[in-house]
């Protein structure tokens, strides 16, 4: 289990990889004590917060209040933890932009039901239309993934700083150091796509990056399905992370019909 996730929450923030890759975006730094480590940061909408790397249910109310008083906001707080905060003293809210999309591994393996019929069709078209092979994404194949990433970035028509290109590029340079896993897909020896992520709790896999060449019809539906099958049966959930309020990203994630939205509450003292 990721040692950052003492409370075993499904949030993608509880990952050294994400903390490191987005350190400049959120201006992260470590505070607190040895037994009560906090990550201080700034949200994308410029709110200062503290993220506890310990189970907040194990500390007293006075200590919890002091942390919030000293830092302004506690984030992310899971819905199951809200009972720790009196509505007379605290207020809380969440932004959909921050919420993680979680899917059962079984859903991505089977794409069940009428609403996922198009996903099944696209998967079938890929399997019937292409000769493919999958290889583990290790440092030896990082260059191939970097080429897929570079081509994907060019296809967006955006600057490197306007997408997750830079963070993905850095992750591909540190696959083993960050204990990341994934696969690269080849279609008739052409580079088709890759996924990269990590286990963030005993039963949750965080899918940090998925980049594909869409000239191969059905590649995204295939790669999600394929890698879900590759994961250990102990992995029950796959976290597609947040959409950051980007309409196209939100629409793409919603089409897979998430089984759970992990809302990340911000808790603060009332004025």
Q: What kind of feature is each model-predicted range?
A:
Residues 143, 147-208:
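A mid-sequence, solvent-exposed acidic-amphipathic segment
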Residues 12-81, 186-214:
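Conserved donor-binding loop and adjoining core beta-sheet/short helix segment
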Residues 89-158:
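Acyltransferase donor/substrate-recognition loop-hinge adjacent to the catalytic core
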Residues 182-270:
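Aromatic (often tryptophan-rich) hydrophobic motifs at membrane interfaces
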Residues 72-79, 102, 134-137, 184, ...:
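A structural signal for short, well-ordered beta-strand segments and their strand-loop junctions
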Residues 83-91, 252-253:
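Short, aromatic/basic amphipathic alpha-helical patches
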Residues 1-5, 11-16:
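Short Lys/Arg-enriched alpha/beta "domain-start" segment
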Residues 77-83, 121-123, 244-245:
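Short, polar loop motifs at secondary-structure junctions
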